[in-house]
Amino acid sequence: MMQQRSGSLSLLSNAVQAGQSSDPMQDDPAKTEPGTPKGYDGSKNSSPASVPSWIHEKTKAGKDRKRLPLACQSCRKKKVKCSGERPSCDQCLKHNIPCIYKSNSTKRSHSRHEEIHHQQQLHLNHQYQHQHKNVAANSIDNLSRQYSQPNHINTHDSVNSPPSYGIMASATNQPLSHPTIVPSSNSSSLLNSTNNISHNPQVSLMSASLSKNLVLDPASPKSVSPDLVYVSSDNPPVSTAASAYSSSLPISDVTRALPLAPASNSQHPSLSSQPVSVPSNTINIPTDSLSIVSNPSQTPAKFDSNRISQVPNSDYSIYSNFNNFPIANHAPSFPQSSVKKLDSSFSPTSLPTFTTNSASSGLSTSYTNNNDTTSDNNSLQAVPRLDPVPSLTLSSTPVAELPPLELRIHLAEVFFHCCHGQSYNLFHRPTFFESLNNNTVPLVVVYAVCAVSARFSSRMHDRFSPPYMAGEQYAREARRLALDNFDRPDLSLVAALLLLSLHDSGTCETGKSWMYGGMALRMAAALQLNCEQGSNPLDLDNIDSGPRISFLERELRRRTFWSCFLMDRYASSHEHLQFLDENDIGIQLPVHELLFTKQIAGVTQTLDGRILEGVPSIVIPADTTENMGVAAYTVKIIALWGRAVKYLKQDGKRRDPYPYWHRNSDFSHISEALYAWADGLPQRLKYSAVGLENHLSIQQGAQYAFLHLAYHHTLMWLFRSIGETENNQLSKISSSVSLAGNTVSFSPVSHTPINVTNGESQNNSNNDPSANGAARRLHKAAREICLRCANAISMIVDDCRKHNVILTSPFIASGVYTAFCVQAEAAFGSNVLAASTARHNLEIDLRLMLEMKNYWGSISALCDKMSEIWADWVQRTSSGIQEEDTIPNEMIDEERMLDLEKHFMYITESPIVPNQAAQKSYSPDLMSYFGFAKNSDLQQWNGLWPSDDLRNYQESTIDSLVAYATGNPGWNISFAG
């Protein structure tokens, strides 16, 4: 035993020198067996650890590789034998020159910026390696002298390997003052290996590359990033919980997430199998109490709430400054249904231990052998995971510009909590966070997600004003990466372009938003996302001849295309064309969110209500709507919104051979489709406060509210157009409000400025008393529908505020703005109950708009327009002008007139607020916002503003609402947002 230790130490001390094999049998070439792979020196290797990494690779034909696939640039220039080791071969290491490998592929695997950055990283690594070579040799000598101590940790046979010069932490009990060099036989980095983390890359959106030229071989040399990392032992590591992401993980614990444990069949000979000695002040977590997620993709879709769990304010890091992260001394908790204990049934050969280094921003990884008698079998030392160097198989970027892992996880949590599902459904949440922890999410997606969600994070508000500009730094990098790869269609690029379009719409970059949205549509068409792949849409059995596509990947393709469809309808709300035709879509609607989370295949309908061809009849349920959730019905209602916009704003009304009131008109067909949508809505999806709470429990509360807000908005906007003449159209009056080309689509409403210079109202509508009764009934029903829809929108927004549901979609702001205009007219009407209810709801609308304008710059234009509308009504009332019902003089055939009254039964009933229940206090700041002096006598509008004082509405953020849900005592203003 002592002889083996002596031999191991001898090789370890010689690792920084020539690195030749110590086996005398290798000097005799005659003893090399035929067909045996040879090392770079032409001799047979005595141990697997001494074989170069490329010897285990396969050729394109699938055979064992027998020679070096590619030499470094220096060896090629000198025409000498190259060992092929990475990051530095023997020749370059001997002459202290940078070792650079050039890709042998004719196709560009990454951009020119990334190649330059990769070469710079290798050069810096080599400089650091040369600078500390003597220091490392002294450290190895110290290790040799301490080896004879009885309590020392045994070394592993894998140290007998040629010098690949990885760096790991010292294995001594006392921290060294310098880093220690240890050889590594595997040139592929642990963080970029595809075999070390137990996840399925096939079902991951990040690896779902649907073009053949995007499929990269993980074992290819160009897909391997250097495994040279630096660790300093000057500062003792700080330990936290070693756990992976869970779908129910509180946001306060996200910053303490550590990488997943490797699969039991994973082997990493490049890593030492000995544990790193951790100082006594670190935390030892017993194995029997440590829980990790064995497979997030199989996690049951059971969520506590989309409200964040209550934690102390000091530990709630989402609202603390970025430079001061509080780290709690406890492991994050997981539900019993979604975790697996570290028992005998789940005991990998070795468990990872990560050691931080604040000085060099590196990472060292070692393994704890479960069979080592000198280590504690009941504890696992864990420390915070730092950022690994991104693999060049994905679009890379300078690490200095990449957000820290903690911030990335935080912004991803904010994205799923505030954005995902309200605008687009793009990602599978468990798989996304698993890939994010494994650093396998394409950087273009990481930057795009950070760009959209940064505006909602209080960590970014301290450094950026206004808040909607907080993500611009990440958007710039996402644009660069997207434009570098725009000619290579990929599912991840489509998602990133959609998010960039959404971000630019919020920063008032309407041109960029329009163009990035168009690029996403083109790329989706190139990937044929509008068609099902193969003859088996559900992947029930492998009957297709081509490569099998899992249900999750198929569903991600569908959801990505439906997100493109929604973006097209949002962006084309006015004069812009709609590019996607409903007749060209041949995919089914998204499945229910619970089925999607559990990765269970389900049959749904297409947009026109059909079942896809090729689906076996045995798997088709009696009612396909059982498999359809909020996402599917959201697509259907937005499709109806697009049809209404096309009729009213894109010359559809002129091409209609029938007048709008006729039963056979296109207007009537849209009205019937809206009624059929509401009538066919399952009972579980009909709006109620209980339904909101039920969907809130599965993190679908905001999406559920958005569904019904979109329905009432579409119905109100459609019937608001009744009675408008060619000279009284908001499309001509409020063109400055409707931001053309913007993803934020603002619907038109009827608002005509009043000329009161002579005390007379100039109105284009002809108040003809001889108008027939059919026209009067039609216009009265249309106005009643608009007012009921407006009050329903305010009630849903108020319910969201009471249940702490965060509304952030810009499309919601469009509906709230329309409701404000309708209610402003009713607030000054002759109906007392309708006026008092409208005045109560006006504040709900205004509070949300004033809140959302901090996060979407284009909404500021709507707030300014609301102030003009309000001032117009005040001026009209002050002049003594009474509003009269004006009915256009048009002859309507009552027998052929469309039926509007049937819509009343599906409009959500809102409570009536009597005038006596309204308060007599006013908000001075809101009055001054609308152009009034703070001390103005406004008693004639008694009850317009309830008692809430909104002096601090500009300082309030969405974070204050979330803080209230977590029990933050500093919360004092409740905004619906």
Curated annotation (Swiss-Prot):
Region called Disordered, residue ranges: 1-65, 176-195, 287-307, 357-380, 751-774
Biased composition (Low complexity): 177-195, 364-379
Secreted as UniProt keyword: no
Main location: cytoplasm
Alphabetical keyword list: Cytoplasm, DNA-binding, Metal-binding, Nucleus, Phosphoprotein, Transcription, Transcription regulation, Zinc
UniProt-listed Pfam families: Fungal_trans (PF04082), Zn_clus (PF00172)
Portion annotated as DNA-binding: 72-99
Residues recorded as bearing Phosphoserine in the entry: S220
Biased composition range(s): Polar residues: 1-24, 751-770
Protein name per UniProt: Uncharacterized transcriptional regulatory protein C1327.01c
Taxonomic source organism: Schizosaccharomyces pombe (strain 972 / ATCC 24843) (Fission yeast)
